[in-house]
Amino acid sequence: MTASRRTLMVMAGGTGGHVFPGLAVAHRMEAAGWRVVWLGNPAGMEATLVPKHGIPMEYVRFGGLRGKGLKTKLTLPFNLLRACWQSLGALRRVRPDVVLGMGGYITFPAGVMTALSGRPLVLHEQNSIAGLANKVLAKFAKRVLVAFPDALPHAEWTGNPIRAELARTEAPKARYASRSGPLHVLVVGGSLGAAALNEVVPRALALLAPGERPRIVHQAGAKHIDALKANYEAAGFAGGDDVRLVPFIDDMASAYAAADLVICRSGAMTVSEIAAVGVAALFVPFPYAVDDHQTTNAAFLADAGAAVLVQQRDLSAQLLADWLRGQSRASLAAMAERSRSLAKPEATDEVARVCAKVAGANLEQLQ
């Protein structure tokens, strides 16, 4: 069987943290001549996003229990059985040579049926603390891959698959050396915004003398941009060249590369992207993340002196202002270089090669 006839099924959904790394691998496999089919939830973001990338989809209806009512919990056995049946149907139609599980609730029933049908399963865990589904499925997978060391026992540390342009960014030493003047700070709230950052950062800047203030690009999410503007105006900033407030950023690679410092949450993909680019970071983990995984994500870099970790409960305008006052471009450049040294820029290729090998393909087809 030639590479062009081989098929990869990617099962992932729910959040961008599962979908985007799955897309990175999918495109890499397509470039090697593979057919790729995506298994996802028709109600998930993947149902809208994945077809835009030209990847056909199979659908399985299955959701989580966290925060759901009694009715959802009582109907779980039926919903799980239905999801298993739908997954089996998709596997029979697609007949994949290998199945790659990238996370999300649908991974559990689809992964179980993959194992029961005798098809090879590869798992990838994006977070530093594995979810329950991957902990169970790891017992049946041919290969288990992790983005952070020790997330699962007997797993291979590959890093998180990221967009190619992030891995191609110029080395931090050269970037930082080419700059002068005020520090450039990127504040990232994500598509959902981060209220704590939106409130504290403007007040922290107001505590700095004009000559101490960095230039700011602050991304807040479309739903939060008006409130963010009000926060900056209340702190005495009317906007201008030194403060840019944006609802979204299309080119994150360039935004990261232009920054001396990123202030942000610590989702798995954010941490992986920051390391890949090599930029200093101050992480404020989302305090309500499942198993507090954002803290351990951030700690991977912070423990190596490659980032700073501040819990939201400890974050204040005074603390942030004092910390910013003590930073120089040289100190941030050193942090950025340590961050880059911990990156896994070949993660996308490595995950693709593992999938090919499990399917019995010649690895030279993925060079």
UniProtKB/Swiss-Prot annotation:
Membrane topology: Peripheral membrane protein
Catalytic activity: di-trans,octa-cis-undecaprenyl diphospho-N-acetyl-alpha-D-muramoyl-L-alanyl-D-glutamyl-meso-2,6-diaminopimeloyl-D-alanyl-D-alanine + UDP-N-acetyl-alpha-D-glucosamine = di-trans,octa-cis-undecaprenyl diphospho-[N-acetyl-alpha-D-glucosaminyl-(1->4)]-N-acetyl-alpha-D-muramoyl-L-alanyl-D-glutamyl-meso-2,6-diaminopimeloyl-D-alanyl-D-alanine + UDP + H(+)
Enzyme Commission numbers on file: 2.4.1.227
Pathway named in the protein's UniProt entry: Cell wall biogenesis; peptidoglycan biosynthesis
Listed GO MF terms: UDP-N-acetyl-D-glucosamine:N-acetylmuramoyl-L-alanyl-D-glutamyl-meso-2,6-diaminopimelyl-D-alanyl-D-alanine-diphosphoundecaprenol 4-beta-N-acetylglucosaminlytransferase activity; undecaprenyldiphospho-muramoylpentapeptide beta-N-acetylglucosaminyltransferase activity
Main location: membrane
Family annotation (InterPro entries): GlcNAc_MurG, Glyco_trans_28_C, GlycoTrans_28_N
Gene Ontology BP annotations: carbohydrate metabolic process; cell division; cell wall organization; lipid glycosylation; peptidoglycan biosynthetic process; regulation of cell shape
Name recorded for this polypeptide: UDP-N-acetylglucosamine--N-acetylmuramyl-(pentapeptide) pyrophosphoryl-undecaprenol N-acetylglucosamine transferase
Gene label: murG
